[in-house]
Amino acid sequence: MSTQFNSNLIWTLLFILSCSKNTNLYPDPNTIIKGQQEWQKKFYFERISEFKNEPIGKNKIVFLGNSIMQGGGNWNNRYKSDNIVNRGISGDYTAGILKRLDEIIFYKPNSVFLMIGINEFFADNSEKPEVNPENVAKNILKIADIITKHSPKTKVFIHTILPINNDQYIKIKEVNYNFLQDNYRPSINSQVKETNSILELNGRYEVIDLHS
C-alpha cells in the first residue's frame, strides 16, 4: 500500500512540475522586441495567448514564421495531415521568433519549417544599419541553430524569403501602414535575393527555394 502511495505521489509531483514548466514557455506581455510597433505587438501577444491555449504537443510538424505561415490557417487541410501546427504570427520579425522558441524546444517537434525575414525589410531601415541581408540571414540561422542545439532530433527546413510585388507594395503604402518605409525603395527585392543567397550557402540546413 505504501509503495503504491509513493508511486502515485511521484507521478502527481511530476505532473505538477510539468504543468508549472509549461507556463514559462511563452514570452510575457512585457517582453520587448526591437522594432516592434503597437499593431505588431497586439497581434504578437494575441497569438501567444492562442498558443498557450493550444500547445504544440508531441510528434508534430511546426510551421514557424510570419503572416505567410499564419495565413495558411489549418495547414493540415492543405496537406491531408493531422499533425501540423501553425506557429505563424502576422508582422513578426526574426527577433520575435527568437523570443518564442522555448515552446518549440520543449515539445521537440519532428520537424520545423521556418519562413521569416521579409518584415525586417518592410520596416524603415534607413537608420537601422543592423537591418541588412547579412544580419537577417544570421538571425534566421540562429533560430535554426537554437532549435537544433536543444532538440537535435528536430529537422529544420528554411524557406527562402518571398519577394514583394512592387505595384501592390505602393498601393498598400497608400493605406498609411506605419511599418512600411516612408520612402519607397525598390531595393527590398534585392535585399531579399541577397539574404536568400546567404541562406542557400549555409551548409547546415536544407533550404526550400520558393523563388529563385
Question: Which role fits each region the language model picked out?
Answer:
Residues N166-L210:
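Substrate-gating cap/lid alpha-helix
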